């Protein structure tokens, strides 16, 4: 029988080891030898860019003529021989984003039909790789991105707008590289692995239209300038002939690993979904309800059980607190699980960061909400104010891993004994 502390340690162990299964260096090293590449320009963009680039360098060495890496602040792990390594803003682009994107375009503008760009792409690329269309300022992009992120819009909707305001998104980067070829290795952080949505699809034909982008802005009541509206009307490319793409990792892989690890530990384990994409607090309440069903009725699984969920929820920010979707999901579940023994829920961003915080997510049990109440705090008020970070910090329920170097959505595990 597990005591609360050992159950907590086990949940964290399963989460961490599952994430290791989608470490980008492993996937890159497995894929590159099959591609017969020589004398390439390497461009790596995203939260996993550094590790992907390092692995590519270890495989290809001097076959890489030039390498440029663009990743999130704090995600570079040091120099790579003869590579230029930059860090930039996420989830909102900043001045460094613009500078580094210009640098990448300088490189590819010199290429001809005999050249190849090895494009290593991972989640976060929408913010880290950006150059607005003429007439649109960085400030306008920042304001619009922030509004979309707070609106509750899905990642597909957000990226539909982003693609229509960018010189590199929605297939425009591959269009700019032409007549050179793009060989892309993609680590997916998008449910369904849609290549036109991952990092806003810089090297894939865009299936969305200008009309779609305008409808998203209208749906969420987001005001924009006339210059932004004019820019959106410039349609993205719908056909590209110079692109070869390889998908090397996704949320299905991390969930499969979690299931396998839980079974090894003696749990009845099942993946409930890899497409969780509702409001974070609703997801927390829903997952808690299934955990209670297992706890008290032994269905849909008998105890000891491990319920595994993959996906990416959204948070419609109405309060002025701090947190992220995984922390909000965990806090919501903690409220629903209050007082129940032998249950634990761990919700984590596979990149090790959740919202604008230092936490990867939260790990809660039946005592989390009780701990807050014993301090004279109301957990529901924290949830209402979108202040999950401070609630979980006070109750000792934050999950802090540091940047993992990968990014394939979120992993949620519920253990019931």
Curated annotation (Swiss-Prot):
Q: Write down the SUPFAM superfamilies for this protein, in alphabetical order.
A: GckA/TtuD-like
One GO CC term on file: cytoplasm
Does the record bear Isomerase in its keywords? no
Q: What is its EC number?
A: 2.7.1.165
Pfam families in alphabetical order: DUF4147 (PF13660), MOFRL (PF05161)
Cofactor field: Mg(2+)
* MF terms in GO: ATP binding; glycerate 2-kinase activity; glycerate kinase activity; magnesium ion binding; phosphotransferase activity, alcohol group as acceptor
Changing residue 47 to A: what effect? Very low residual kinase activity
Q: Which keywords, in A-to-Z order, does the entry hold?
A: ATP-binding, Kinase, Nucleotide-binding, Transferase
Stated family:
Belongs to the glycerate kinase type-1 family.
Assembly state and interactors? Homodimer.
From the Swiss-Prot or TrEMBL record, give the protein name.
D-glycerate 2-kinase
What organism does this protein naturally occur in? Answer: Thermotoga maritima (strain ATCC 43589 / DSM 3109 / JCM 10099 / NBRC 100826 / MSB8)
């Amino acid at each position: 029988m597990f005591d609360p502390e050992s159950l907590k340690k086990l949940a964290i162990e399963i989460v961490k080891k599952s994430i290791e299964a989608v470490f980008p260096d492993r996937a890159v090293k497995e894929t590159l030898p099959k591609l017969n590449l020589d004398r390439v320009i390497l461009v790596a963009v995203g939260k996993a860019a550094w590790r992907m680039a390092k692995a590519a360098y270890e495989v290809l060495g001097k076959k890489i003529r030039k390498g440029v890496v663009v990743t999130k602040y704090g995600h570079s792990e040091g120099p790579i021989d003869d590579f230029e390594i930059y860090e930039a803003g996420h989830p909102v682009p900043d001045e460094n984003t613009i500078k580094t994107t210009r640098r990448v375009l300088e490189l590819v503008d010199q290429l001809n039909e005999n050249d190849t760009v090895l494009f290593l792409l991972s989640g976060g690329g929408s913010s880290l790789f950006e150059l607005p269309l003429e007439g649109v300022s960085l400030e306008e992009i920042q304001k619009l991105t922030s509004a979309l992120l707070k609106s509750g819009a899905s990642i597909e909707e957000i990226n539909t707008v982003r693609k229509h305001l960018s010189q590199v998104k929605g297939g425009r980067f591959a269009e700019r590289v032409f007549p050179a070829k793009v060989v892309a290795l993609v680590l997916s952080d998008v449910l369904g692995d849609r290549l036109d949505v991952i990092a806003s699809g810089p090297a894939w034909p865009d299936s969305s239209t200008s009309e779609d982008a305008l409808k998203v802005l209208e749906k969420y009541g987001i005001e924009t300038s006339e210059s932004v509206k004019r820019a959106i009307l410039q349609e993205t490319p719908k056909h590209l002939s110079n692109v070869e793409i390889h998908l090397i990792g996704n949320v299905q892989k991390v969930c499969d690993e979690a299931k396998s690890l839980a079974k090894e530990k003696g749990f009845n384990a099942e993946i409930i979904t890899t497409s969780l994409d509702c409001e974070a607090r609703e997801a927390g309440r829903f997952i808690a309800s299934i955990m209670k069903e297992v706890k008290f009725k032994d269905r849909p699984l008998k105890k000891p059980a491990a319920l595994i969920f993959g996906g990416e929820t959204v948070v419609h920010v109405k309060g002025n607190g701090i947190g992220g979707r995984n922390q909000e999901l965990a806090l919501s579940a903690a409220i629903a699980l209050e007082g129940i023994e032998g249950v634990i829920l761990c919700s984590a961003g596979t990149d090790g960061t959740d919202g604008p915080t230092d936490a990867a997510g939260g790990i809660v049990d039946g005592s989390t909400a009780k701990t807050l109440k014993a301090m004279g705090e109301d957990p529901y008020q924290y949830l209402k104010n979108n202040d999950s970070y401070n609630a979980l910090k006070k109750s000792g329920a934050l999950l802090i891993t540091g940047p993992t170097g990968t990014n394939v959505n979120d992993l949620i595990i519920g253990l019931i004994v």
